[in-house]
C-alpha cells in the first residue's frame, strides 16, 4: 500500500514537472524580448519564407447555380519555418513539440482570393504545432464560398470546374514563396455529396511572366452532377408530355378534343420551362440541355397544332365546298395507306353492298310503277267487246284505219316517271356526296397517320441525340483527366 502511494506521488510529480516544462518552453518561445509576431521570420530582407500549402476537402456543401457560388468545407494545411521558435530538447526534458495559439505567432496571411461573401479568413484559428527545429504545422478549418463560373450547356448532365485561388494578402513573391505540398487535394476525410461526384482535384502553382512578384496556388475542383434527381423530376415528365403530343395524331378527329390536348401539352411545357429558368443562371452564353429539349418539344407541339388545324379542315370538307383533285385521290387513297400500314376498306364492304341493294330496289320500284301506269292507260281506251274476245294483249290494229290518237293521260305517266327518276337521282347524289365526304375523312386519317410516324421518328432520334452527346463528352473529358493525372507535371 505504501509502495502504491509512492508511485502515485511520483506520477503526479512527473506531470507537474512536465507542465512546468511546457510552461517554461512557451514562456521562452513567446518572450517579447526575443519574439515579435508582426515580424516576418527572415534573417534579412532578401530571405524568402517558403510556405507549403495543401487543401484537404472535408465536404462539398453546395453549388448554387443561379448565384454561381460553390460552398466548401476545407482544411488548409500550411507549413513553414520560423528560426525564432527553436529550442534544444535537452533543455526542456526532451520536449520536441509544443502547441501554441496561432494568433500569438506570425502567420503568412494566406487567403482565398476568389471569395464570394467577404469572409477571406479561416473559420477557426486552431493551435499551431511547433517543432524544436522551428518548423510550424498549422491546419485551420474553413468554410469558403468561392465564385464559380457555371457552364449550363449540358445541364443536368453537366461537369463543372470551380477553382479556388490562394495567395498571401500582403506579402509578394520576394518575401513569401508559396509551394504546393501535394499535386492533388486530399480526400482522406471527405464526406460524399448527394448531388455531386468529385472527378479530380488537381492543384497548380501559378506565376505571372509579366510580374515577377506574383505567385498563387490554385486548386481545380472538377465535379460532375448526379443527374438522377433531375432525370426523375424533370426529364422523364418532359418525355411523357412529348409522348402526349405524339398521341394527338392518333386521336380521332370526330372526338373534337385534338386542339384541347395540343394546348394542354403546350401549357405543361411552358410550366417546365419556367421551372428551369429558376434553377439555371440567367446567362446568354449557353442554353441548358433541358431548355433545348423543351424548346425542341415546344416546336413539335406548335407544329402539331398547325397540322391538327389542317387535318380538321380536311376532315370536315364536303363536295359542296371542295373538289378532290385526282392527285389527292391517288396519293392519299391508294399509295400512302399501304406505306403507312393502313388497311383501306374494300369495295365489297357492308356499306357498299347496302348501297347496291338500295339501287336495285329503286330500279325495281320504278319499273313496277311504270307498268301499272301503262296498264291503266290502255284499259281506258279499249273496246269492252273486243277486250273480252281478244283481251288487252290481243289488241291489234284494224286495217284501213290510221293510228290511234294520243292518250289523254300520257302526261301523268311521264310526270310519275320523272318523279321517280328525280327521287332516284337525289338519293344517288346524296350517296355520292356521302362517299366523297368519307373519302375526305379517310384522307384526313392518312395525314394524321403520316405525321404520327414523322413525329415518332423525330422525337426518338431528337431525344437520343440530345441526351447522348453530353454523356460521351463527359466520358472523353474523364479519359483526358486520367491521362493528365498519369503524366508528371513540372512546377
UniProtKB/Swiss-Prot annotation:
Explain what switches its activity on or off, per the activity regulation comment: Activated by a myriad of ligands such as acetylcholine, cytisine, nicotine, choline and epibatidine. nAChR activity is inhibited by the antagonist alpha-conotoxins BuIA, PnIA, PnIC, GID and MII, small disulfide-constrained peptides from cone snails.
The family annotation for this protein states: Belongs to the ligand-gated ion channel (TC 1.A.9) family. Acetylcholine receptor (TC 1.A.9.1) subfamily. Beta-2/CHRNB2 sub-subfamily.
Subunit info here reads:
Neuronal AChR is a heteropentamer composed of two different types of subunits: alpha and beta. CHRNB2/Beta-2 subunit can be combined to CHRNA2/alpha-2, CHRNA3/alpha-3 or CHRNA4/alpha-4, CHRNA5/alpha-5, CHRNA6/alpha-6 and CHRNB3/beta-3 to give rise to functional receptors.
Biological process according to GO: acetylcholine receptor signaling pathway; behavioral response to nicotine; chemical synaptic transmission; membrane depolarization; memory; monoatomic ion transmembrane transport; response to hypoxia; synaptic transmission, cholinergic
Task: Indicate what this protein is called per its UniProt record.
Answer: Neuronal acetylcholine receptor subunit beta-2
Subcellular location per UniProt equals:
Synaptic cell membrane; Cell membrane
Span of the signal peptide:
1-18
Gene expressing this chain: CHRNB2
Q: Which residues are glycosylated?
A: 44, 161
Reactions catalysed according to its record: Ca(2+)(in) = Ca(2+)(out); K(+)(in) = K(+)(out); Na(+)(in) = Na(+)(out)
Return the PROSITE patterns for the record: NEUROTR_ION_CHANNEL (PS00236)
Q: Which residues lie on this side of the membrane: Cytoplasmic?
A: 252-258, 315-449
Q: Where are the transmembrane segments?
A: 227-251, 259-277, 293-314, 450-468
Extracellular domain ranges by topology: 19-226, 278-292
Tell me which residues are marked as the site Key residue for a rapid dissociation (K(off)) from the conotoxin BuIA.
129, 137
| Species lineage | Eukaryota, Metazoa, Chordata, Craniata, Vertebrata
Q: List the disulfide bonds.
A: 148-162
| Protein role | Component of neuronal acetylcholine receptors (nAChRs) that function as pentameric, ligand-gated cation channels with high calcium permeability among other activities. nAChRs are excitatory neurotrasnmitter receptors formed by a collection of nAChR subunits known to mediate synaptic transmission in the nervous system and the neuromuscular junction. Each nAchR subunit confers differential attributes to channel properties, including activation, deactivation and desensitization kinetics, pH sensitivity, cation permeability, and binding to allosteric modulators.
